[in-house]
UniProtKB/Swiss-Prot annotation:
InterPro entries cross-referenced by the UniProt entry: Man_deHydtase, Xyl_isomerase-like_sf
Pathway(s) annotated for this protein in UniProt: Carbohydrate metabolism; pentose and glucuronate interconversion
Name the UniProt record assigns to this protein: Mannonate dehydratase
A Gene Ontology biological process term: D-glucuronate catabolic process
Record's function text: Catalyzes the dehydration of D-mannonate.
Cofactor(s) the protein needs: Fe(2+); Mn(2+)
Taxonomic source organism: Enterococcus faecalis (strain ATCC 700802 / V583)
Length: 357
């Protein structure tokens, strides 16, 4: 596998590349241009500058996470063709720079949601937490205020200040948009961008809903196996694939993750590998990566990935804040670095067991 690490760029991340480089076995980073808003075209010069900054530290730029999709595309407004053209141009520019992996999401208004970005555990570590009971007593605007108040001054993707300023406009844009509408709008988008991906040798991976159920009455279309199979059927191409996030999908205990991996493994283009701990119905903590820390059997998940022959990019995901580190919530160095070495150990042991058979 290719061992990755998410990095938000020198201006947006507290972690320097030279520290990421010291993680054993690291292959490279999955990067982004944090200053780009949904709908902006990424220029070749900007992409090359990002790539060169990574390669100068002895790492590879393994992919982009994410090229955000403008809400006009997701809501299906009459402006969507303009923004799809911009997205197609960005894909062409990424292809010119040798980028072969793009993660994206297709969620209305909220890319992800948590109700506590600094939930204190008994050992003093801080985790991200979601509690549906808290959401039931909130308005969507309150979620923006909560996230910003706990962001530690970092620019959190999907929760940019610019989006808060446009919030009423966004609510109006999605008024009346159903799950079926959202699926058809995704089909419209994929039918126009996947041919470009095929030309440029780029694989797309749609990220699951986080959490994988409806909040604030907004439609969700990447919640479970049936949803993911439906998306793969919209455009039957290896370029139209899944970012399989074990933490997002695993937050719903009715999702059988090993079965999901085996069912759609041939179309998994990217893996986020992390654990969650169930604290009650629709209440969970994003805990440390090992099985002992949470509710998922991480060894079983690695076995499923090995069984389907997955050898693409895999990275640790949301980690705890530990050892008094000051970093973006969920994206500190220490817990994710330990997570990556744990993932590598699982892979090594699983492959060794396979080879002894």
């Amino acid at each position: 596998m290719k061992w990755g690490f998410r990095w938000y760029g020198a201006a947006g991340d507290a972690i320097p590349l030279k520290h990421i480089r010291q993680i054993p076995g690291i292959t490279g980073v999955v990067g982004t241009l944090l200053n780009k808003l949904p709908g902006d075209v990424w220029t070749v010069a900007e992409i090359q500058a990002l790539k060169q900054s990574v390669e100068q530290e002895g790492l590879a730029l393994l992919g982009i996470e994410s090229v955000a999709i403008h809400d006009a595309i997701k809501a299906g407004t009459d402006q969507r063709d303009h923004y799809i053209d911009n997205y197609r141009q960005t894909l062409r520019n990424l292809g010119k720079c040798g980028i072969s992996l793009v993660c994206y999401s297709f969620k209305p208004i909220f890319g992800w949601a948590k109700t506590d970005l600094a939930y204190e555990n008994e050992d003093g570590s801080l985790s991200l937490l979601f509690d549906q009971a808290v959401v039931e007593n909130m308005q969507p605007e309150d979620m923006y205020q909560l996230i910003h108040s706990q962001s530690k001054g970092f620019r959190l993707p999907g929760w940019e200040e610019e989006r808060l300023q446009q919030f009423q406009e966004l609510k109006a844009m999605y008024a009346g948009v159903t799950e079926e509408d959202l699926v058809e709008n995704l089909r419209y988008f994929l039918e126009r961008v996947i041919p470009v991906c095929e030309e440029e040798n780029i694989k797309m991976g749609i990220h699951p809903d986080d959490p994988p159920w409806e909040i604030f009455g907004l439609p969700r279309i990447t919640k479970n196996l049936a949803d993911l199979k439906r998306i793969l059927s919209l455009v039957d191409s290896p370029a139209n694939g899944i970012t399989f996030c074990t933490g997002s999908l695993g937050a719903d205990p009715t999702n059988d993750l090993p079965t999901m991996i085996r069912e759609i493994g041939h179309r998994i283009n990217f893996v986020h590998f992390r654990n969650v701990k169930y604290l009650g119905e629709h209440r969970f903590e994003e805990t440390a990566h090992p099985s002992v820390a949470g509710s998922l059997d991480m060894a079983e998940l690695m076995q499923a990935l090995v069984d389907v022959g997955y050898e693409g990019v895999i990275r640790p995901d949301h980690g705890r804040a530990i050892w008094d580190e000051k970093a973006m919530p969920g994206y500190g160095l220490y817990d994710r670095a330990m997570g990556l070495t744990y993932i590598q150990g699982l892979y090594e042991a699983t492959k060794a067991k396979q080879n002894r058979k």
